[in-house]
């Protein structure tokens, strides 16, 4: 049975890539495409918007009008909008793949609560490579974490609105969990002025926002005499879009529950 997918934020950078990825993937089809109310893109053909030709799917700002046209919603927008979409999907039993970042604790709890009713994949990054990096970081932290200084460095385009990136925070969380630390107390997100000597148990973060950088992350494990770097560089958003569609296909058989890309890729068995 073909999975019908709705894409929120269809006119954005990720939205257009998602439309392309859905169109290029067997077993799924684009059922609906959505934009915010008042957008000049409402009424456009989603395929033409994504640069792949006419698809016959008209961009709309009304989820309710498309109830029969999508089984699953992919959402890479902003927290306030995503939370509204979650409430809609719970009310109408629609599955979700969420790539939005920047949620506060209350937002994350809302996602967890919604997953008791519907199935959700919620991940900070849908790249297969990044999720493999998460596993590598756990292994590196287990061996070196108590003896090496750990720093997470990330760079994104000038339009990104949250910092550090959700991926950088996830990297820190994977490391902290492995070491039995709480990232909220051990994470250092800014250094300025006379900071004093670095504490060994800190997990530092540095953020760069410039130009059109798609996404770059590097984690340093540094000691006197050597430094190990585990890095990932994305050259196209298509890697995230393909991962999100892969997650959507995997989620098709799940009735409810909260999952991430570790589940989708079966990385717990590595």
Swiss-Prot record:
Disulfide bonds: none annotated. Its main location: cytoplasm. (S)-2,3,4,5-tetrahydrodipicolinate binds at residues 157, 166-167. InterPro entries: DapB_C, DapB_N, DapB_N_CS, DHDPR_bac, NAD(P)-bd_dom_sf. Pfam families: DapB_C, DapB_N. Keywords: Amino-acid biosynthesis, Cytoplasm, Diaminopimelate biosynthesis, Lysine biosynthesis, NAD, NADP, Oxidoreductase. The keyword NADP applies. Its EC number is 1.17.1.8. Gene3D superfamilies: Dihydrodipicolinate Reductase, domain 2, NAD(P)-binding Rossmann-like Domain. Catalyzes the conversion of 4-hydroxy-tetrahydrodipicolinate (HTPA) to tetrahydrodipicolinate. This is 4-hydroxy-tetrahydrodipicolinate reductase. It comes from Glaesserella parasuis serovar 5 (strain SH0165).
């Amino acid at each position: 049975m073909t999975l019908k997918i709705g894409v929120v934020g269809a006119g954005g950078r990720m939205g257009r890539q998602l439309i392309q990825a859905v169109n290029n993937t067997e077993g799924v089809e684009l059922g609906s495409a959505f934009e915010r109310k008042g957008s000049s893109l409402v009424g456009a053909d989603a395929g033409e918007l994504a640069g792949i030709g006419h698809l016959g799917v008209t961009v709309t700002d009304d989820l309710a009008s498309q109830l029969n046209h999508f089984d699953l919603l992919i959402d890479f927008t902003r927290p306030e909008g995503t939370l509204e979409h979650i409430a809609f999907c719970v009310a109408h039993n629609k599955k979700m793949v969420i790539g939005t970042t920047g949620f506060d604790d209350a937002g994350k709890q809302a996602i967890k609560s919604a997953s008791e009713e519907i199935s959700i994949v919620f991940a900070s990054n849908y790249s297969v490579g990044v999720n493999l990096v998460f596993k590598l970081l756990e292994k590196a932290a287990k061996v070196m974490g108590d003896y090496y200084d750990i720093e997470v460095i990330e760079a994104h385009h000038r339009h990104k609105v949250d910092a550090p990136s959700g991926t950088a925070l996830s990297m820190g969380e994977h490391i902290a969990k492995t070491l039995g630390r709480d990232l909220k107390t051990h994470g250092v997100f800014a250094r300025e002025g006379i900071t004093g000597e670095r504490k060994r148990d800190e997990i530092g973060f540095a953020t760069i926002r410039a130009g059109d950088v798609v996404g770059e992350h590097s984690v340093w494990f540094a000691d006197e005499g050597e430094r190990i770097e585990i890095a990932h560089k994305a050259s196209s958003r298509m890697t995230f879009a393909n991962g999100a569609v892969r997650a959507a296909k995997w989620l098709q058989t799940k009735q409810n529950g909260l999952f991430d890309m570790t589940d989708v890729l079966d990385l717990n068995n590595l």
